[in-house]
Amino acid sequence: MQEQYNPQDIEQKVQQHWDNNKTFVVTEDPTKEKFYCLSMFPYPSGRLHMGHVRNYTIGDVVSRFQRLQGKNVMQPIGWDAFGLPAENAAVKNNTAPAPWTYENIEYMKNQLKLLGFGYDWNREFATCTPEYYRWEQEFFTKLYEKGLVYKKTSSVNWCPNDQTVLANEQVEDGCCWRCDTPVEQKEIPQWFIKITEYAQELLDDLDKLEGWPEMVKTMQRNWIGRSEGVELKFEVKGQQDLEVYTTRPDTLMGVTYVGIAAGHPLAKIAAENNPELAAFIEECKNTKVAEAELATMEKKGMATGLTAIHPLNGREVPVYVANFVLMDYGTGAVMAVPAHDQRDFEFATKYGLDIIPVIKPIDGSELDISEAAYTEKGVLFDSGEFDGLEFQAAFDAIAAKLEAEGKGTKTVNFRLRDWGVSRQRYWGAPIPMVTTEDGQVHPVPADQLPVILPEDVVMDGVTSPIKADKEWAKTTFNGEPALRETDTFDTFMESSWYYARYCSPQADDILDPEKANYWLPVDQYIGGIEHACMHLLYSRFFHKLLRDAGYVTSDEPFKQLLCQGMVLADAFYYTNDKGGKEWVSPTEVKVERDGKGRITSAVDNEGRNVEHSGMIKMSKSKNNGIDPQEMVDKYGADTVRLFMMFASPADMTLEWQESGVEGANRFLKRVWKLVNEHTSKGAAEAVDAAALSGDQKALRRDVHKTIAKVTDDVARRQTFNTAIAAVMELMNKLAKAPQESAQDRAILDEALKAVVAMLYPITPHICFEMWTALGQQDIDNASWPTYDEQALVEDEKLIVVQVNGKVRGKITVAADATKEQVEEIGLNEENVSKHLDGVTIRKVIYVPGKLLSIVAN
């Protein structure tokens, strides 16, 4: 091997070897245990960022480790290639989304290869190709035929100036990002998949996911939001009954008004002859409210003039349109109990409505609703026959009475809504439905799929090219003229089943069941926690759809889930003439730090003093991203990978520090130097355990302890940073160890082979070279080192000796020494015997192998 470590030469050579030998190409092998490792596939934005590098390094470390465990490992990669950014970039760069996307894929593919990730490139695909989305389209039509797909009107962001639908991220402060026109809410027909049919199973099966972070499971439980309650009817004079859902039927006797959503049919009827109410309803509709903001937003409402009749006591209560009632949740109507619900309380206080308390504290303390509602569960009063009942008894009794009178029923409700998959964008998979002239909607027959998205288009930045081109929509169905659906699928559709397509990317169907059932479920999935409620939930749903269609036998797609932390970096800015912040790249800033490493001054390349905004997530908007390419060019891929795995636990945030990268580079140089010095002296003989001295045994014990710890850290705990720290600690001992005798060299040889094998998943290129230099063959197919139980056995033990609770000495005894032998040596230790002079020993306690405690007075 060369004397100097030169990453560029080594990495290019090793990557060429992997390419030529198709090292990471796999097929199904029933004789081997399989391991499917997958990192969330990237959106081809143009260049890799450090978040990608972290995600894919973790995946590659897990894959290579499992490979050395003798498993048949599949690690695929592909491209989540549809989406809005491509449309925006196409408009900006005067091109079409397709060429922009394909160019980015080529560039990023090359970057991934330079980082040495062991992907099976034979399985690569981009979701924007008809070969991929054709199967999604066909599966959608099958779901339609099963009754799991339907169309209904739903609200979208509408720009009246551009006459176009906007995605949520295109609405800035309530206005269109392009022309600054106030955005309206518009009801348009959209396609939905009935995820709610699977709500209970999606909830129950979270308990099967033992390898998932508890936090992600909790987020999904809350998102699914199962609740038990009562659905009841209020009669409305001269109108249809009003249905409401409540989880607190115990408060029913405290209802003083009913709130309905602006989109509720009753609201529309009430507004017909009430211009003021009609205007208020419009205002509500155009104020898009996120559910999270409901608690803090200003509560507004207007009386409809309608009156509802309480189902049990017959009291008349007013019906209000209220901005905090959402049509998408429950029935779009709520029974309001101001005394026992804070939102209802604020509304009633504002509009001078009655507040009637009917629940008091169980402990008998005084009820106080002067400032806020009493929302705890308690004991009923002023509730007629239900007085004195506590929550559960009242729930059951009131529900039973409502059921007996035909006015209500116990029911389970879910917060989860059906999945709206229509997008009024161009760059997505066309929805395979047509409408004939008689208004009937039909799925496109399988023999006419895929419905291909035209790629040679001109983007005007306003209207989708397939909506603008009236000819594109014209087609036939059973020989009759028909119009195609011009909406495209939500891009979560493509990412909900891509993991399964990797199992058989060439299959002439959505999946090849035999191959899919060999590889699935994914054994290890890696990605950001921001995907907890959307992508991860939709993928679980899609997997169950595939199972029920007979394609897979498993219930869940991902066995283990690791959510990697974000990558942070220093961010700097100066204030421009208009008072805005101009962000300066940290690579263009010179900083001075105090003794504790805190930044005391920062000056950019223009000589300007800049403010340090702290360590924050790397992003384009803060201009604090570090280009992985530059780091690879400067230090090599192995150094970047090592820093990524060492600087922080995989699931915690990682602070980017170039000094840390330099440290990782120095460590690799040290390992290289020691291997080079060792191999330059020729081959070493085998370890003869029986012939080792005490010091040699101790060093060899350290080697095998390290193997045991690293194996556990990587395989079970997934604390890769502590595994690396253990190898570094061992390297420090090896560097200082004598190399005089043949057995000294034998131990070092065994140790270096173990070190190289343990570092291989993290830094594969340098380890490939060092492995060969150590006289070994083909590290990619080697075995993970195993520790020798015998080597871990200690001949001697270090025992701490205490007198009256204070440490007075340490003694070395034979590992199998008896209590009497230890006592004799301990009592005669020089410092111990000094402290026993002139006192009476009352008790001697021996904790085997650890402690001798003497009590004396």
Swiss-Prot record:
Pfam families documented for this protein? Anticodon_1, tRNA-synt_1, tRNA-synt_1_2, tRNA-synt_1g
Q: State any GO CC term.
A: cytosol
- Could you tell me where this protein is found in the cell? Cytoplasm
Record keywords, A-Z:
Aminoacyl-tRNA synthetase, ATP-binding, Cytoplasm, Ligase, Nucleotide-binding, Protein biosynthesis
**InterPro entries documented for this protein:** aa-tRNA-synth_I_CS (IPR001412), aa-tRNA-synth_Ia (IPR002300), Leu-tRNA-ligase (IPR002302), Leu_tRNA-synth_edit (IPR025709), M/V/L/I-tRNA-synth_anticd-bd (IPR013155), Methionyl/Leucyl_tRNA_Synth (IPR015413), Rossmann-like_a/b/a_fold (IPR014729), tRNAsynth_Ia_anticodon-bd (IPR009080)
Reactions mediated catalytically: tRNA(Leu) + L-leucine + ATP = L-leucyl-tRNA(Leu) + AMP + diphosphate
EC numbers: 6.1.1.4
Renumbered to this chain, motif 'HIGH' region spans: 42-52
Which GO terms fall under molecular function for this chain's record? Answer: aminoacyl-tRNA deacylase activity; ATP binding; leucine-tRNA ligase activity
Q: Which PROSITE patterns match?
A: AA_TRNA_LIGASE_I
* GO BP field: leucyl-tRNA aminoacylation
- Summarize where ATP binds, as residue positions: K620
Motif 'KMSKS' region, chain ranges: 617-621
Which family does the UniProt entry place this protein in?
A: Belongs to the class-I aminoacyl-tRNA synthetase family.
- Return the protein name: Leucine--tRNA ligase
**Gene behind the chain:** leuS
